[in-house]
């Protein structure tokens, strides 16, 4: 993949990005790189700074400090050069209330040299039978139309802000299949999400953002590693440090919320035995025991001490 001037480049480079709204620091030194042809997910809870980051990358906001380059260009100064190659899906939609789906898509398609076939795109996203005006569309219909608007120009890079929010399960799966097809076609995708299954299924690279900072970055496999998770419920307020001391080296024990415990370790029968024995010695009994691979949510909880959906 090449930049607009013909040179090979990463699709997006964000370096020490900072942004404030009045006295509120929304972004504090955010840095990451998006490889051309990849799917990168910005993962974090609502209010983490994901949308602000994407809006700077799209050229809708100027950074307070730091820099952003899209195909090697400044997204604000070089907006005209980037516009034909970049698709944007906005949470707010940016569509007139009286507009209807197909006329909107046909109008947008007229601005591009090689647009996608509007009827095919509308059918794929279930918009071909939507007759309501934008103000009367359901939340899911608005999301599907916003996604179609981002894709109709056949972009080389597309920003998708919470692409499946408000969609029913079938529409969500369809949107995921479209993202997977975009990657297969060599299109670079940057999406924001707080949905773990969305990030784990779609992303080649995940950037975990919390309170305006990047707290981790890597492929889903790199972030989750080889550790497994044992969860159980017991009396609230147990000494998690004392329990961890009875487990194999490197084991991590957390309580969140009160009375719910997570043990991250390479699990084996000896770990379950040690947990059960320690609980018994401390006057409680573990129940609701389950185990599985460490997830991105486990990683987020470990890094921030709070649930991803908080």
Sequence positions of predicted segments:
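ABC transporter nucleotide-binding domain
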Residues: 175-266
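Conserved ABC ATPase "signature" region
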Residues: 106, 110, 116-131
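Hydrophobic anchor residue at the start of the ABC signature
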Residues: 147
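Helix-to-loop junction immediately C-terminal to a conserved catalytic motif
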Residues: 58
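Catalytic Walker B motif of ABC-type/P-loop ATPase nucleotide-binding domains
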Residues: 158-162
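Conserved ABC transporter NBD signature motif
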Residues: 66-74, 81-82
């Amino acid at each position: 993949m090449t930049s607009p001037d013909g040179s090979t480049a990463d699709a997006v480079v964000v370096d020490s990005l900072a942004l404030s709204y009045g006295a509120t620091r929304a972004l504090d030194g955010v840095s990451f790189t998006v490889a051309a042809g990849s799917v990168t997910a910005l993962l974090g809870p609502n209010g983490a700074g994901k949308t602000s980051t994407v809006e700077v990358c799209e050229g809708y906001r100027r950074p307070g400090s730091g820099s952003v380059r899209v195909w090697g260009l400044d997204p604000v100064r070089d907006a005209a050069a980037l516009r034909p190659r970049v698709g944007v899906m906005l949470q707010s939609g940016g569509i007139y209330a009286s507009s209807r789906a197909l006329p909107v898509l046909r109008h947008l398609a007229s601005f591009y040299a090689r647009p996608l076939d509007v009827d095919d795109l509308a059918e794929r996203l279930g918009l071909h039978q939507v007759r309501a005006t934008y103000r009367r569309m359901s939340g899911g219909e608005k999301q599907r139309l916003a996604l179609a608007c981002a894709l109709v120009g056949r972009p080389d890079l597309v920003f998708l802000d919470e692409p499946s929010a408000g969609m029913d399960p079938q529409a969500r799966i369809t949107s995921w299949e479209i993202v997977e097809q975009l990657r297969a076609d060599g299109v670079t995708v940057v999406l924001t999400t707080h949905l773990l299954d969305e990030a784990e299924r779609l992303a080649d690279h995940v950037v975990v953002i919390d309170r305006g900072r990047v707290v981790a970055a890597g492929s889903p496999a790199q972030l989750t590693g080889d550790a497994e998770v044992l969860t159980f419920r017991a009396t609230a307020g147990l000494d998690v440090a004392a329990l961890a001391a009875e487990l194999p080296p490197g084991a991590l024990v957390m309580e969140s919320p009160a009375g719910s415990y997570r043990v991250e370790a390479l699990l084996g029968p000896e770990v379950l035995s040690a947990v059960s024995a320690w609980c018994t010695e401390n006057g409680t009994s573990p129940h609701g025991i389950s185990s599985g691979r460490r997830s991105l949510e486990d990683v987020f909880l470990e890094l921030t001490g709070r649930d991803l959906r908080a």
